[in-house]
Amino acid sequence: VSASNREILIDPLVSLDKDPVVGLRAAATAAQLGLPLSLDSFTSLAEKLKKGEGALTNPWPREARELLIALIGAGESMVDIFETLDQEEIIFQWIPEWMSVRSLPQRNALHRHTVDRHMVETAVHAAKLTRKVQRPDLLLFAALFHDIGKGAQEDHSERGVRLIEPIARRIGFDSKEIEIVKNLILHHLLLSSTATRRDLDDPATIQSVLTAIPDVNTLELLHALSIADGEATGSAGWSDWKATLVNDLVHRVKRAMAGAEVAPQPEVSDEQSALALKGQLRVSVQEHSSGLAVEVISPDKPGLLSIVAGVLNISRLDVKSARTKTIGSS
C-alpha cells in the first residue's frame, strides 16, 4: 500500500493469498490520512476477491480486525472510503450481511439517511466519543452494525442480536466481547426511549435500566452509542433537551449501580403541605436548563392530572414527566 498523487494505491503485483488484509489496510490508511482510494486499485481488488483470492480466515486475523476498527474510527473521512468499498462490492466479500441493508429505506420519517448510510454516519459520530469509554473498539463496531437487523417484519433490535453474533465471532471478538456487543444492539434505543417516555423520579424507571445493563462500562458504551445514533438521525431525532434527559438518566443509573438509593422520592415541604391543606389553587413555575418545572397545588378531584396536562398541552407545553402527592383526605 502506498500514496501517489494524493491517493492510496495497492501494488498491482501483490498476492492477496499471501497478504489477504491488504484491502483493509489500504482502506484504513486512506480513511486515517483523509485520502481517496485509487479506483483502479480497488476495481482490481474487487475482481480478485470475487474470484476467491485473498479470502479472510474465520476468525479473521487480529490485524484484519484492528484495521476494520481503524477504518470505522477514522471519523468523517471514512464515509467516502466506505462508499467506494460498497460501490465496488468489496465490503460484501468481507461482511456479506451488509448486502441486506444496502440502500434500505427507513420506515421512520425521523431518519434522513438510508439504513446503511445511517449506520456509517453513526460510526462517524461514535468516533468522537471513543475517549469517553473503556472499549472504543466495541463502541465503533456496535455503531456500524446497530441497525443490521432492519429490513424484516420483526423487532430490528432482536433480529440484530441474532445477526451480529456470527459477524462478531467471524471478525475475531471473543465470547465476552460478543455479549457486550449483543447487549448494545439489543438495547440501543433503551436510554433514549426511557429518558423521554418515563418518569425519571420513579424507582421502577431506574430499575428497568439496571435490569438490562449489567455494569458501568456497558452503560457508558450504551450512552455513547445513544448519542451517536441520535446525532446521526438528525435534529428531528436528537436535541439538547433529549441529550439532557439521557444524561440525567445515565447519572441516576450510575448512582444506583454504586449503591445509592434508587430515585428517592422527594418529601413534600411544610410550606407545600400548608398550602395544600388550605384547599386553594396555586400554580408556580420555575425555569431550569432542561425546561420548566410547573407546580400545581389544588383540591383533589377525579381527573385532576389529566386536566392539568390538558391545560399545559393547550399552552403548547410538552409534559415530560409528572409526580403527584395527595395530602390529607382531599
Residue ranges and their predicted role:
Residues 17-28, 62-69, 79-83, 88, ...:
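Non-catalytic, well-ordered alpha-helical scaffold segments
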Residues 1-8, 80, 203-330:
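Regulatory modules associated with amino-acid/nitrogen control
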Residues 16, 58-61, 71, 75, ...:
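Conserved phosphate/pyrophosphate-binding and hydrolysis machinery centered on Walker-type P-loop NTPases
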Residues 2-7, 42-49, 59-65, 97-105, ...:
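Short acidic (Asp/Glu) and glycine-rich catalytic loops that position anionic groups and cofactors
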Residues 114, 129-255:
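Divalent metal-dependent catalytic cores for phosphoryl transfer on phosphate-bearing substrates
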Residues 38-45, 60-65, 79-88, 94-101, ...:
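Short coil/turn segments at secondary-structure boundaries
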Residues 1-109:
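Non-catalytic interface/linker regions that flank or bridge core catalytic/transmembrane domains
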Residues 2-8, 87-148:
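Active-site-adjacent "gating/activation" loops or surface patches in catalytic cores
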